[in-house]
Design a protein with these regions (language model features):
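Conserved, well-folded catalytic cores of nucleic-acid-processing
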Residues: 14-17, 33-37, 56, 75, ...
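AAA+ P-loop NTPase domains with strong preference for DNA replication initiators
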Residues: 1-51
Length: 110
């Protein structure tokens, strides 16, 4: 399913509101993952999205990308404003999984 991409400035603003730090490598990877997912939400995150990001960022393997995204999400969850997180994930008591986070933010921002 092809969709309309979301503006990068809106995406990055939302990530910063959730507590993501722009100086972490995972921040850029999360932003790119969400942007790619909005362009083709039918693709599998682990089987298609991480390898596609690894091609775009050759310094990272798909495994390293998954780990960096997970770390960035967990850090933002731990240190970010809880009320912002509740807007997107009202029922969670722990950080969302990568796929859940990417899909939810992509759908909310489209």
């Amino acid at each position: 399913m092809q969709t309309i991409p979301i503006p990068q400035n809106q995406l990055r603003h939302t990530l910063r509101q959730l507590g993501f730090s722009a100086h972490h490598s995972g921040y850029r990877l999360v932003a790119e993952a969400i942007a790619m997912y909005t362009q083709n939400s039918a693709q599998s995150i682990t089987k298609a999205l991480y390898p596609a990001l690894a091609k775009q960022f050759p310094a990272y393997s798909a495994v390293n990308i998954e780990r960096a995204i997970r770390y960035a999400i967990n850090e933002a969850w731990e240190h970010g404003p809880r009320e912002q997180w509740q807007q997107y994930f009202p029922h969670l008591t722990k950080a969302p999984a990568n796929a859940c986070f990417i899909a939810t933010l992509a759908e909310e921002l489209m």
